[in-house]
């Protein structure tokens, strides 16, 4: 049986519901939305969809698979019959759009072509049959520009410059002011551009145009911006895009025509208004709205234009309600009005901010559309981070330079940069950047990702900048027409103020205001809506959530966000403070044990005070403290000048310091003299740390604070190491408890971060009371990859399909995960109730689902990621219980 590659709108694979997962994989997001709207009885221009799998086949051979040409031809013939027009006819031509449509929405990342089928002769026929020459030549020049850019590879700016030249010649400020004759001049200029760039005339055969356009959409699946978007959003590079060939309807035939984009609820806040939310442009085509080249009008103004527009508004109101009821979600829709008749072009679950996501989930639950569990499954856990962004200090009164459209909420402070690639460079240097553009385009995606905020002079709520910024959770102010941006001089002028690249500004994505300089921000808190989601999450999750915290402040912040303990307290971070680094260096540079103990006695009070603060902050929650992990050379200066300064401060010879640094240097420190190896060779270091932990525990215990210290031994690979360190801890504990006249409960466990430790887990568990996985080092040692050097090749590995995602971001379930399962089974075969957690930074939802399934007790993350982990753990529990 041959594989079917083309479906006419309304048809679905195996007659499945249009919103089924099978249909999404075959027809793509746009394809299933068109099929669904037809089945719902909505006005949709007819057409057909070429499947996502066909794109995958095309990528392998760069040619159409056998049978595709015949399927396209038969569906094109059916379209001609239903529309009563002929493709390629010069008197009344059937014109089509060719659009991409992947299974997962990738707004603006791939290519679109409108008005395909026009040529030098059929444009005259279109003018005659419509009686509107201006419309015909406007459609032709749009088609030539899109086709030239997408299919012929001609720089988009060349067409824009030619258009601007004609507008300047005739004194026209906007595109709609151009007459039919003037637009015909634009078309002639475009013909010359095509000949100059390709050596050939602009393609005149509509069937050739269609084949080239379909190929271009297939190829756009692998363009750099699309690949970057998929990598940023962890999307499968192998799913391919569908191609939708759809009969054209025109929003540029006059003032009773137009095009628009709407949302059934506000994509910024989630609010459901009494009026329709969205934007539209009269006498325009669809790309005009999302491109942000013209600033559109609010949809609620539509019924005030005239009776025809009011009728469209009323029909659109019914469609809003029907679509939201069908999707049970906030819907993003696109439409065109042609000579007063409404046509629907697309509907899909809309991109939204984290604030809107939470508000919509809660409201739909209140409205009876969703259960709590269903509402939680609509939450993207990573977008919870947006609630934790800083906001501007209300006590500060900044200088307001101007105002644009508040396109994506938040507060962003950074230096101005006009170039997306330069933004990436500055971000690499640690600078916070406001990407400042006339308007953004899909090519800007990497710069937008690295910027802290986005400012555009053109565009509206539904422009590319706004949609992508909301999807990324970036602060964005769009359509700030007070901004004059000059890329050549790298300047931004607002009123009488002139700014150059590198100057600081601040933007408020909630109000749309632009402020002078760097405005002070304050820390966020838990809102009522977020608290509701947290309460729901805590009701359904099984995994406990701990935090990584090295200071009392970090511990207090994590408790505020709901942390149920500390999963990793890194003691080495405490030694880098200015008031203790010298004592640490004295200890390292000591020539014998006695001198080392003297230096360690100086460090003991510092460590004890740190632990007192942390124990008080956690008040009864478990605190997992890792003994010294990094090699000693990391605490010493590496340059000659700094070594000389240290020698002077310690009253030692420079040569002595330099030789000691050289002695401690390691060829491969990750696998060298670190962790448990330090504790066994220099037991006095571990003894000091254990004493500090347990003395602090005794002190706070006497003050009435419940304390649960957990002492973790890092980087071990054998039960022998565990036995030696367990005995050391018990020996120090006995001494401390005798001195303080009291005891506290404590546990001794280990960090599982080497493959051999996973294999030997049953034996290690004979002494270790708990395990905590260190997934960073376990990933490094399993793959044989240094995390610090992986950036040189992991992106290429992802491009080539060797990795689907970065294994240091999303846990490798097949390799590292298999070792973890082995360790869990081994550990619990010895201790059936063994507590097992993870102390690497793990809030990736896919990783948390896996960790839930293999039976971990807790995960741990940075303080500000605790709410994210709480939600991800709840989603994991719901999915596991419902086999999703």
Swiss-Prot record:
Active site per the UniProt annotation: 464 (tele-phosphohistidine intermediate), 839 (proton donor)
Region described as Linker 2: 508-542
Gene3D superfamilies the UniProt entry points to: 1.20.80.30, ATP-grasp fold, A domain, ATP-grasp fold, B domain, Phosphoenolpyruvate-binding domains, Phosphohistidine domain, Pyruvate Phosphate Dikinase, domain 2
S-S bridge residues: none
Region listing for C-terminal, in residue ranges: 543-884
Binding site for ATP: 99
Activity regulation, per record: Activated by light-induced dephosphorylation. Inhibited by dark-induced phosphorylation. Both reactions are catalyzed by PDRP1.
Reactions the enzyme catalyzes: pyruvate + phosphate + ATP = phosphoenolpyruvate + AMP + diphosphate + H(+)
Required cofactor(s): Mg(2+)
Keywords: ATP-binding, Kinase, Magnesium, Metal-binding, Nucleotide-binding, Phosphoprotein, Transferase
Residue positions where Phosphothreonine is found in the record: 462
Binding site for substrate: 570, 626, 753, 774-777
Post-translational modification: Phosphorylation of Thr-462 in the dark inactivates the enzyme. Dephosphorylation upon light stimulation reactivates the enzyme.
Region span, Central: 409-507
PROSITE patterns: PEP_ENZYMES_2, PEP_ENZYMES_PHOS_SITE
Signal peptide: none
Region (Linker 1): 352-408
EC numbers on record: 2.7.9.1
One MF annotation (Gene Ontology) recorded for this entry: metal ion binding
Protein family (similarity comment): Belongs to the PEP-utilizing enzyme family.
Subunit structure: Homodimer.
Annotated NCBIfam families: pyru_phos_dikin (TIGR01828)
Protein role: Catalyzes the reversible phosphorylation of pyruvate and phosphate.
Note on domains (UniProt): The N-terminal domain contains the ATP/Pi binding site, the central domain the pyrophosphate/phosphate carrier histidine, and the C-terminal domain the pyruvate binding site.
Other facts: The reaction takes place in three steps, each mediated by a carrier histidine residue located on the surface of the central domain. The two first partial reactions are catalyzed at an active site located on the N-terminal domain, and the third partial reaction is catalyzed at an active site located on the C-terminal domain. For catalytic turnover, the central domain swivels from the concave surface of the N-terminal domain to that of the C-terminal domain.
Name of protein: Pyruvate, phosphate dikinase
Species of the source: Giardia intestinalis (Giardia lamblia)
């Amino acid at each position: 049986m041959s594989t079917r590659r083309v479906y006419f709108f309304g048809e679905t694979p195996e007659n499945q519901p249009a919103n089924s997962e099978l249909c999404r994989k075959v027809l793509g997001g746009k394809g299933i939305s068109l099929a669904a709207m037809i089945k719902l009885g909505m006005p949709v221009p007819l057409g057909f969809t070429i499947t996502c799998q066909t794109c995958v086949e095309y990528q392998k051979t760069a040619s159409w698979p056998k049978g595709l040409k015949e399927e396209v031809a038969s569906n094109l013939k059916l379209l001609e019959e239903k529309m009563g027009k002929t493709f390629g006819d010069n008197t009344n031509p059937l014109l089509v759009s060719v659009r991409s449509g992947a299974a997962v929405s990738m707004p603006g990342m791939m290519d679109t072509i409108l008005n395909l089928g026009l040529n030098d002769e059929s444009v005259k026929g279109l003018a005659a049959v419509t009686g509107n020459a201006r419309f015909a030549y406007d459609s032709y020049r749009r088609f030539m520009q899109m086709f030239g850019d997408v299919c012929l590879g001609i720089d988009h700016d060349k067409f824009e410059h030619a258009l601007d030249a004609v507008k300047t010649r005739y004194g026209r400020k906007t595109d709609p002011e151009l007459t039919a004759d003037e637009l015909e001049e634009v078309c002639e200029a475009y013909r010359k551009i095509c000949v100059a760039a390709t050596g050939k005339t602009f393609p005149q055969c509509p069937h050739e145009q269609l084949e080239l356009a379909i190929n271009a959409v297939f190829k756009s699946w692998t363009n750099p911006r699309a690949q970057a978007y998929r990598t940023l959003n962890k999307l499968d590079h192998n799913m391919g895009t569908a191609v939708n060939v759809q009969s054209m309807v025109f929003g540029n035939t006059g003032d009773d025509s137009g095009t628009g984009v709407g949302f059934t609820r506000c994509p910024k806040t989630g609010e459901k208004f009494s009026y329709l939310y969205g934007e539209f442009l009269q006498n325009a085509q669809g790309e005009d709205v999302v491109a942000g080249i013209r600033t559109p009008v609010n949809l609620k103004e539509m019924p005030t234009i005239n009776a025809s527009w009011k009728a469209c508004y009323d029909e659109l109101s019914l469609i809003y309600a029907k679509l939201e009821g069908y999707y049970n979600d906030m819907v993003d829709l696109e439409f065109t009005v042609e000579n007063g008749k409404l046509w629907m072009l697309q509907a899909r679950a809309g991109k939204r901010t984290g604030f809107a996501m939470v508000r919509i989930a809660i409201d739909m639950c209140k409205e009876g559309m969703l259960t709590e569990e269903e509402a939680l499954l609509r939450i993207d856990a990573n977008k919870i981070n947006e609630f934790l962004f800083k906001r501007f200090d209300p006590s500060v009164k900044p200088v307001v330079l101007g105002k644009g459209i508040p396109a994506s909420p938040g507060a962003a402070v950074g230096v101005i940069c006009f170039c997306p690639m330069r933004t990436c460079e500055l971000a690499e240097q640690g600078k916070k950047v406001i990407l400042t553009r006339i308007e953004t385009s899909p090519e800007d995606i990497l710069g937008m990702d690295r910027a802290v905020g986005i400012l555009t002079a053109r565009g509206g709520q539904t422009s590319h900048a706004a949609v992508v910024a909301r999807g990324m959770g970036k602060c964005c102010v769009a359509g700030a027409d007070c901004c004059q941006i000059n890329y050549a001089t790298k300047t931004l002028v607002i009123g009488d103020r002139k700014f150059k690249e590198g100057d600081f500004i601040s933007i408020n994505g909630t109000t749309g205001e632009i402020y002078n300089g760097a405005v002070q921000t304050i820390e966020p808190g838990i809102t009522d809506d977020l608290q509701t989601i947290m309460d729901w999450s805590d009701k359904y999750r099984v995994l406990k959530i701990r935090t990584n915290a090295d200071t009392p402040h970090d511990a207090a912040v994590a408790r505020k966000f709901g942390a149920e303990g500390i999963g990793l307290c890194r003691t080495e971070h405490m030694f880098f403070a200015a008031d203790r680094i010298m004592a640490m260096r004295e200890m390292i540079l000591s020539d014998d044990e006695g001198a080392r103990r003297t230096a360690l006695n100086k460090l003991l009070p510092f460590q004890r005070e740190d632990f007192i603060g942390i124990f008080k902050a956690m008040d009864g929650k478990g605190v997992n403290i890792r003994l010294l992990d990094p090699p000693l050379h990391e605490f010493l200066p590496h340059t000659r000048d700094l070594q000389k300064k240290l020698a002077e401060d310690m009253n030692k010879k420079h040569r002595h310091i330099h030789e000691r640094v050289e002695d401690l240097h390691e060829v491969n420190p990750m696998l060298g003299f670190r962790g448990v190896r330090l504790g066994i060779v220099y037991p006095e270091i571990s003894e000091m740390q254990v004493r500090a932990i347990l003395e602090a525990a005794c002190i706070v215990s006497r003050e009435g604070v419940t304390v649960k210290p957990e002492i973790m031994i890092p980087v071990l690979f054998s039960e022998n190491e565990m036995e030696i360190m367990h005995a050391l801890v018990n020996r120090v504990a006995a001494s401390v408890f005798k001195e303080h006249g009291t005891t506290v409960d404590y546990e001794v466990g280990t960090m599982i971060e080497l493959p051999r430790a996973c294999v030997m887990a049953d034996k290690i568990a004979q002494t270790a009371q708990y395990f905590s996985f260190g997934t960073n080092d376990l990933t490094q040692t399993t793959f044989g990859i240094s995390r610090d050097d992986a950036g040189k090749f992991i992106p290429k590995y992802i491009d080539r399909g060797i990795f689907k995602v970065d294994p240091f971001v999303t846990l490798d379930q097949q390799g590292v995960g298999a070792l973890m399962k082995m360790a869990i089974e081994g550990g619990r075969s010895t201790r059936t109730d063994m507590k097992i957690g993870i102390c690497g930074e793990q809030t990736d939802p896919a990783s948390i689902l896996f960790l839930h399934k293999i039976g971990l007790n807790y995960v741990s993350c940075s303080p500000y990621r605790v709410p994210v982990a709480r939600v991800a753990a709840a989603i994991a529990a719901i999915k596991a219980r419902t086999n999703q």
